[in-house]
Amino acid sequence: MKKFKYSEITPEKIYHKRRSFMRSISYGLGALTLSSVPLVNTKASNLNEPTSYDNITTYNNYYEFGTGKGDPHKRAKNFTTRPWNIKIEGLVEKPLELSIEEVLSIKSEERILKLRCVEGWSMVIPWLGFSLSELLNKVQIKPKAKFVEFETVYNPEEMVGQRYPVLNWPYIEGLRIDEAMHPLTTVVTGLYGKTLPNQNGAPLRIFIPWKYGFKSAKAIVKIRLTEKMPNTAWKNASPKEYGFYSNVNPEVDHPRWSQATERVIGESILAPRIKTLMFN
C-alpha cells in the first residue's frame, strides 16, 4: 500500500494539530496476500499542497443529490440516516440484518487512503472504518458465490437526484469475492475521526483504494452475494466507458480523456497535474 508523508495528508486544521495519521498505514502492509487482487502502489508520492477538509466535504460526486460537485453538500444536509439497517443476503448460509448502531459497534481504525476519481482528480482522506470481510465472515458465504453486490438506499423524496433517470436507480456496484475480502476494502463510517458526513456517503459506504471512486457505493442498505456479475449502475449506463473492474490504471485511458495524470483537489487551477500511479 502507498505510504503518504504527513505533509501530504488532507488536513482539518492539521487534524486538530495532535493526531498522527500514520498509525493506520501499518494495517494491511503485511496482509496484501491475495495474488488476484492488485496491490496499492507503494512508490513515493509527488503530491504538492494538501487539499482541505472543506474540499473533502464540498467537492463530491453523488448523483443521488445532483450532478454538480457542490450539490451533495447543499442538498444532503437533511438526509435521514437514522434509523438505518443494512441487510446481507443472497448466497449465504446465515442472512443478516444489522442496525447502523450494530455496525458502528465494530471496532474502527483510521485508514489514510487516496481517492482517485475516474474524471481525473484525487484527494487523500483519513477514513474511519473496518474491513468489509468482518461483515462477510458473519454470514458464511456459499461456495457458489462469486461476486458481492452493493445497493444504495432508494429515497427520491430526500435524494432529489433519484427523481431523474440520470442512472438506473437504486445505485448498484459490485466486486469479486476476493476483492471484497481484501483487508483494504473498507466499510467507511467516518472521516477525520468524526461521523461520516451525509454528502460523503453516510451512514456507511464502501471504499476500495485501487479502484476509481465510482466503485465505492454510498449510503448502503443491502450487500448481496451472487453467482453472476452484478449489473452495476455506471456499467449499465455506459459499458464502453465504465467497466466492472475499473482499477486505477494510467495506461488505460477513458474513451474521452487520458488517465495518465490527475488533478489534486485544492491546488491552484494552474498547478501542474501529477502522474497517476498504477493501482493508485
Which residues does each predicted region cover?
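Sec-dependent signal peptide hydrophobic core
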Residues: 25-33
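Functionally constrained cores in energy, signaling, and assembly domains
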Residues: 16, 27, 38, 50, ...
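Basic side chains
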Residues: 18-19, 23, 205
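N-terminal secretory signal peptides
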Residues: 1-20, 34-35, 41-43
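Structured, non-membrane catalytic/scaffold regions adjacent to prosthetic-group chemistry
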Residues: 44-280
